A protein has these predicted regions:
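Aromatic "clamp/platform" in nucleotide-sugar-dependent glycosyltransferases that forms part
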Residues: 209
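Conserved donor-binding/catalytic core segment of Leloir-type glycosyltransferases
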Residues: 125-145, 151-155, 165-166
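Short hydrophobic beta-strand element within catalytic cores of glycosyltransferases
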Residues: 226-229, 243-244
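Acidic anion/phosphate-binding donor-loop and adjacent secondary structure
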Residues: 79-80, 113, 117-132
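A charged, aromatic-enriched C-terminal amphipathic alpha-helix characteristic of glycosyltransferases
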Residues: 265-274, 281-311
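Extended catalytic core of nucleotide-activated donor transferases of GT-like folds
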Residues: 3, 27-103, 192-193
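Nucleotide-activated donor-binding/catalytic signature segment of Leloir-type glycosyltransferases, i.e.
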Residues: 172-195, 203
Length: 311
């Protein structure tokens, strides 16, 4: 029996850890809370290189004789504090992008690949393309998500009433922006409510500076949506699409959480982003074949590590 430990579910890494737990029909425990049982066969924790957080996770070690640890990164290089993870001999990452960066900077750790997982869904057909709905899911206040540039590109398209942009915010505080043609959905949604967001939208857009993975786009692909992505980070390993926005690699330019201003990430081409939005809108693309994404999800279900104990 597995125990999965992670942060609150509004956090992206909380969601992906919970999805692993759902895959194995196992318990998900939010860090800081007590597990339901006294002991488990194996534990899984998604960790970031923050000493206080790592000390919290260490309090769970007694519940499981064996642990699997995972982390992620979005810049090159990464913060030196990732060296704190050397307390773990092996750490899994969800993309080759992350593995190559971390392996180069911290060779003492064994970095192994374990893809993120989400359940494949039977796509629900959208009955109308008027208005044509673009959408994106994530922490829209996070500068890495580059949402203001997405809004600017969308407004330059001048779709007027023929299109709409829906932003599902996964922020800890409500976002009250007032932008014509843009709807912001705040708060943690139930699975059924989130499914409705997918079902009533047409085209998913990710224009992040970088993604360790970018599960919103992956989940849209698993619902056969057309997806616009950027080419810096791990997302392009998960989603194959003709609507890829090229990035120029360069410094972030400011300090933010684990990011330093001298670290590099991608700067998406706003002209190409706008062109991709216009192309999907003009062609009214509402479905796309994402066989590659589905195959990756199937591979995750067969990961040998899951079989090291019963679920």
């Amino acid at each position: 029996m597995w125990l999965f430990v992670g942060p609150q579910l509004l956090a992206g890494i909380g969601q992906v850890t919970k999805q692993y737990a759902d895959l194995l029909e196992a318990e998900y425990c939010q860090v800081g809370q007590r597990p339901k049982r006294a002991g488990y066969d194996r534990g899984f924790a998604f960790v970031l290189p923050i000493k206080e957080q790592l000390d919290l996770f260490d309090q769970y070690r007694a519940f499981c004789p064996e642990w699997t640890y995972m982390t992620v990164c979005e810049t090159e290089p990464v913060n030196d504090c990732y060296g704190l993870l050397e307390r773990y001999p092996e750490i899994h990452v969800p993309s080759e992008f992350s593995r190559q960066i971390l392996e180069k900077q911290f060779p003492k750790i064994k970095w192994s690949l374990l893809r993120h997982w989400s359940e494949s869904k039977v796509p629900r057909g959208v009955t109308s393309v008027t208005p044509y709905v673009f959408y994106s899911i994530g922490n829209i206040l996070d500068p890495r998500k580059n949402i203001k540039k997405l809004i600017e590109a969308y407004l330059r398209c001048e779709f007027r009433d023929a299109a709409h942009l829906v932003l599902k915010a996964t922020c800890t505080q409500p976002v009250e922006w007032r932008v014509p043609g843009v709807t912001i959905i705040n708060g943690l949604l139930s699975p059924a409510e989130l499914e409705k967001v997918h079902a009533t939208s047409h085209c998913y857009v990710n224009c992040s500076h970088s993604e360790g993975v970018g599960m919103g786009a992956v989940e849209a692909a698993l619902r056969s949506k057309p997806v616009v992505i950027t080419d810096y980070g791990g997302l392009k390993e998960y989603v194959k699409t003709p609507w890829v926005v090229p990035c120029t690699t360069g410094p972030i330019g400011f300090d933010d959480f684990l990011f330093k201003k001298e670290h590099n990430w991608g700067h998406p081409d706003s002209v190409v982003l706008q062109a991709h939005l216009e192309d999907c809108f003009q062609k009214k693309v509402v479905a796309w074949d994402h066989s590659h994404t589905r195959e990756l999800m199937d591979e995750v279900t067969r990961w040998p590590g899951w079989r090291q104990c019963s679920s």
